[in-house]
Amino acid sequence: MKSVEQYRNQKVLVLGLAKSGVNAARLLHKLGAFVTVNDKKKFDENPDAQELLSDGIKVITGGHPLSLLDEDFKVVVKNPGIPYSNPIVSGAQEKGIPVITEVELASQILAGELIGVTGTNGKTTTTTMITMMLNQRTNAGKAYVAGNIGVPASAIAQKATAADTMVTELSSFMLCGIQTLHPHIAVITNIYSTHLDYHGSRENYVKAKMRITMNQTANDYLVINWDSEEWRQLSKQSQATVVPFSRQANTKDGAYEEAGKLYFKDEYIMDAADIRIPGDHNVENALAAIAVAKLQAVPTAGIVQVLKTFTGVRHRTQYVETYQDRQFYNDSKATNLVSTEMALKGFDQPVILLAGGLDRGNTFEKLAPALKAHVKTLIVFGETAEKMADAGRLAGIQDIEFTDNCETAVPIAWQHSQAGDIIMLSPACASWDQYPNFEVRGDRFIKAIEQLTGKAEEN
């Protein structure tokens, strides 16, 4: 951890708690700041606020009073999920107070190297692959995973040494709140239209993603998907050295797939079929990770070892178990239709799909071809249940069932299944209409499977 004096004896507002807010507040307190924490949850229902108060940090809960702006704050550190339309946030900006996110704070104290990974889909898997590959090196420091993957970057930055690397998953929400964050290697897996309710337009969403490279120089690297003309054009905005990856062999200047084999420049790495986790999208993720690993001098044998053994990340096309010749997969992280489409394309077997969730105003017609090609039974729930069913009807699916939630969908899926089927939760929607987050949704799905198979009694 670098020595930082800029916050000592300065007033700082931490807006919104959860993991990132709690860690930011504690770090700022450690750095000598006068920290005020503000969270909308009531104090008696807010264990995070209670703990921070016991640590000597000022806590204001139960709402976001505008009177907070009367304080002479040097900076506001906001939870990434709080929109910039929030009156406290917009008011701070109007007063010229910098508004940053916890990952920006973490980057300011990080002694080691930063690798940032963003994109619409594949961030978590790619971040994890890269971290595992870097830890195959024997003559380098430790690689830590951090960020939107569930581990606050500020917690990792405090323990990482100058020899270490922090591989950080960066959401568009986080990237809106950076100013000086400077990854030596930035990765953009892909960019599709999502989170438009937060950003207001696709243009704003793309701008947020491209902020990952705004502080890079020619001595840094931008690893970017080369299989879209839009993405190729976006790379021209960066000052970094561009290292492309491609499943369509659109380039041989980086990592690419050709005739079922994976290469980095002219070096053969492995056969795509030997990657442990299924799906063409995971080949893309692997190529991005290979590019980073090669830039960081990871031996090819170490890269292959990871890709042959890595079984995936929890809630991302996560294999749960096989019961009476039916395989269960938890893809709760699939919060947009592109993620669900990619997950479906990873299977040759018939799929019973559990889908639905928060209604952000979009429709699902574009999912129909994948539904038609892969889904035998569609079980829908949540605010988008009817819209999802419409996509199923458009795809010609005859077997469509409505239910309350993903837990009640499990026994229904079982009733409609046969030996050899895949039963998969891949909602194509955010979870917030019924669950606090996608992790809880996925855990409830797994619990329902355990109830079905009898493992719940064993536990």
Swiss-Prot record:
GO biological process, one term: regulation of cell shape
An example Gene Ontology CC term for this record: cytoplasm
Gene3D superfamilies: Mur ligase, C-terminal domain (3.90.190.20), Mur-like, catalytic domain (3.40.1190.10), NAD(P)-binding Rossmann-like Domain (3.40.50.720)
Pathway the protein acts in: Cell wall biogenesis; peptidoglycan biosynthesis
Annotated compartments: Cytoplasm
Keywords of this entry: ATP-binding, Cell cycle, Cell division, Cell shape, Cell wall biogenesis/degradation, Cytoplasm, Ligase, Nucleotide-binding, Peptidoglycan synthesis
InterPro entries: Folylpolyglutamate_synth_CS, Mur-like_cat_sf, Mur_ligase_C, Mur_ligase_C_dom_sf, Mur_ligase_cen, MurD
Swiss-Prot/TrEMBL catalytic activity: UDP-N-acetyl-alpha-D-muramoyl-L-alanine + D-glutamate + ATP = UDP-N-acetyl-alpha-D-muramoyl-L-alanyl-D-glutamate + ADP + phosphate + H(+)
Residues holding ATP: G119, T120, N121, G122, K123, T124, T125
Disulfide bonds: none
GO MF annotation list: ATP binding; tetrahydrofolylpolyglutamate synthase activity; UDP-N-acetylmuramoylalanine-D-glutamate ligase activity
EC number of this enzyme: 6.3.2.9
Similarity comment text for this entry: Belongs to the MurCDEF family.
Function, as annotated: Cell wall formation. Catalyzes the addition of glutamate to the nucleotide precursor UDP-N-acetylmuramoyl-L-alanine (UMA).
Record's protein name: UDP-N-acetylmuramoylalanine--D-glutamate ligase
Organism from which the protein derives: Lactiplantibacillus plantarum (strain ATCC BAA-793 / NCIMB 8826 / WCFS1) (Lactobacillus plantarum)
